[in-house]
């Protein structure tokens, strides 16, 4: 049994968050991506990159007690106030399938960046597509294949 809490990212969290992301990439994504692709992604999630990303987004961490076990952020899509983008949503493999990812997405969808936007997008790994589909995200423009960055674009639109 674990005790799940979520809170906003704090300075100093970037080291544990980087570890969560790199561990998850290395273990959970190995069935869908090449070792070279995973290694490139791990290099792009250093503590410095995470700290910068957290300054640009509303970034949250999921904790079991005091241990960071997951993370995720939401930001304006290319600076837009009408569109948002979910970023860096990861859950340690040992906690996957236990509601942590769902709670992270629900927290992001309760954030002001989600509420002000008519459209929210996420670039999903192949590994996580079914998770986002369960959370109500649809394939952007009906495209189910990965893009040039190796992700599948999904979106959620508010009824207009």
Predicted segments — roles?
Residues 145-160:
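Terminal substrate-recognition subdomain of acyl/acetyltransferases
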